[in-house]
């Protein structure tokens, strides 16, 4: 099968980009031919960061010039710029090689699905919500709904073309089913199993440095537990560089921050840590949580979203207010390392991910 993977922005190096790489790797192992439609990005850096050496040498690259200063992902300006560039690249491929695809696999935002008469699979994270003018309950809400109406109609049209949504958690699936009302299946992302090392009194967190991750709370907790070491491993987002710099400036004496760590460094810290602390509320899934658990870290996560599905029973702890966290860290330190966490992490292995994805593809009629 010839599969067109659409992931407009790969430079974020977050969970979505990781899942895109996993999807490409899986489809290649199934024997499919993969073309990646994206703006130009540093393929070697991405391969090193996620540990997929030579991955992009095995795909057909359909890259267009980078779009700088044209708005954020999902904005009208960003959509117009990318969709126009995608259309030109697809037209070139068709004109010069007569190339035809069997399937479109959108691994980022549904708004970027190209207008092609093909079946569409969409990785499902979280649906965008636009208020309908018919449901506006105030003049201000009505004005806002009218302003966003063109974008709302654009997304409605794109979503209507999706044949199957692959939701990355039951939390995501529930919201996607409610808003999109498209056929869906639950497919947890594949996670690496990290070998535990010699443990020390280390608390670690891993995230893309954006405000929604609430990483400043990590330092707040660190100041309340000066006897432990705290390490923050972050990927810098080009749109939020000031946020990451601010985090480094306010790091406490017992805290350190590492920017854009290599895969080996990332695994080393997970292997040595006793506790993994996750600050975000309503996270869609949480690959780094699972990988920390595989290294026998005890996870402490907010009692919401995808992490609530991951961390259950004796596999870790869930918090509702930040005041609960320091005592949870003490408890986790006493009980480390956690065999229960490692056992639970194995439910989200790459092997299980590929088996689930293969099962879905085997049922498709293209």
Q: Where do the model's predicted regions map?
A:
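Conserved acidic donor-binding segment of nucleotide-sugar-dependent glycosyltransferases
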Residues: 313-323, 330-334
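Conserved donor-binding/catalytic core segment of Leloir-type glycosyltransferases
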Residues: 166, 191, 196-213, 219-225, ...
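Glycosyltransferase donor-sugar binding loop
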Residues: 40, 229-245, 259
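Membrane-proximal helix-turn-helix segments that form the acceptor-binding/catalytic region
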Residues: 94, 138-165
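Short hydrophobic beta-strand element within catalytic cores of glycosyltransferases
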Residues: 298-301
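Nucleotide-activated donor-binding/catalytic signature segment of Leloir-type glycosyltransferases, i.e.
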Residues: 244-262
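A charged, aromatic-enriched C-terminal amphipathic alpha-helix characteristic of glycosyltransferases
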Residues: 323, 333-364
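Aromatic "clamp/platform" in nucleotide-sugar-dependent glycosyltransferases that forms part
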Residues: 281
């Amino acid at each position: 099968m010839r599969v067109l993977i659409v992931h407009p922005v790969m430079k974020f190096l977050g969970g979505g980009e990781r899942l895109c790489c996993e999807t490409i790797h899986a489809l290649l192992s199934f024997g499919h031919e993969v073309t990646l439609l994206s703006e130009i990005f540093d393929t070697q850096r991405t391969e090193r960061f996620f540990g997929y050496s030579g991955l992009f040498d095995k795909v057909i690259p359909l890259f267009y010039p980078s779009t700088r200063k044209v708005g954020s992902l999902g904005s009208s300006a960003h959509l117009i710029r990318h969709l126009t560039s995608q259309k030109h690249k697809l037209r070139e491929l068709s004109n010069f090689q007569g190339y035809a695809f069997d399937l479109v696999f959108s691994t980022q935002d549904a708004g970027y699905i190209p207008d092609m008469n093909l079946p569409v699979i969409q990785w499902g994270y979280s649906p965008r919500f636009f208020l309908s003018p018919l449901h506006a309950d105030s003049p201000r809400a009505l004005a806002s709904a009218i302003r966003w109406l063109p974008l709302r109609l654009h997304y409605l049209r794109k979503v209507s073309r999706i044949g199957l949504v692959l939701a990355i958690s039951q939390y995501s699936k529930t919201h996607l089913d409610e808003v999109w009302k498209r056929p869906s299946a639950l497919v947890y992302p594949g996670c690496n199993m990290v070998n535990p090392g010699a443990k020390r009194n280390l608390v670690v967190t891993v995230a893309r440095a954006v405000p929604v991750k609430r990483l400043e709370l990590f330092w707040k907790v660190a100041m309340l537990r000066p006897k432990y070491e705290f390490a923050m491993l972050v990927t810098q987002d080009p749109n939020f560089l000031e946020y990451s710099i601010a985090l480094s400036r306010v790091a406490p004496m017992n805290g350190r921050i590492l920017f854009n760590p290599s895969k080996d460094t990332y695994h080393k810290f997970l292997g040595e840590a006793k506790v993994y602390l996750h600050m975000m509320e309503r996270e869609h899934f949480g690959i780094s949580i699972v990988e920390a658990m595989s290294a026998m870290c005890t996870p402490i996560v907010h009692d919401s979203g995808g992490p609530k599905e991951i961390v259950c029973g004796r596999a870790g702890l869930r918090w509702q207010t930040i005041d609960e966290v320091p005592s949870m860290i003490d408890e986790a330190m006493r009980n480390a390392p956690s065999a229960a966490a490692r056992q639970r992490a194995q439910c989200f292995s790459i092997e299980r991910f590929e088996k689930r994805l293969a099962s879905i593809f085997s049922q498709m009629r293209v």
